[in-house]
Amino acid sequence: MMNDNNERKPLRTIKGLVISNKMQKTVTVLVERQIKHALYGKYIKRSTKLHAHDADDLCNEGDVVLMTEVAPISKTKNWRVVEIVARSD
C-alpha cells in the first residue's frame, strides 16, 4: 500500500576514499565497514568498491567523499558524490 502522506525514506549516505578518477564524471570509491564474526565475535574489516557520479570532476585520488544513493545513472553507478570531506595532500 502507498503511504497517504507521501513520506520518503531518508537518503542513504556513506563515506569513502577515492581510489580512482580516471573515468569521465565518475570516481571509484573504496568503502570500508566492520562486521562481527558470527562464531568468534571478532570485528573484521570488509571493503567494497563503488562507482559514484562526480559531475564536475572535482575529486582526486586520496580524497574522502560523502556519497548518497540515487536512481541508477548507468549499469554500475548508483551513487552520487555530495561533498568532499577531506582533500588529499
From Swiss-Prot:
GO terms for cellular component: cytosolic small ribosomal subunit. One of its GO terms (molecular function) is rRNA binding. GO terms for biological process: translation. The keyword rRNA-binding applies. It holds the Pfam family Ribosomal_S17. The keyword Ribosomal protein applies. SUPFAM superfamilies: Nucleic acid-binding proteins. Keywords: Ribonucleoprotein, Ribosomal protein, RNA-binding, rRNA-binding. Belongs to the universal ribosomal protein uS17 family. Part of the 30S ribosomal subunit. One of the primary rRNA binding proteins, it binds specifically to the 5'-end of 16S ribosomal RNA. HAMAP family: Ribosomal_uS17_B. This is Small ribosomal subunit protein uS17. It comes from Xylella fastidiosa (strain Temecula1 / ATCC 700964). The gene is rpsQ.
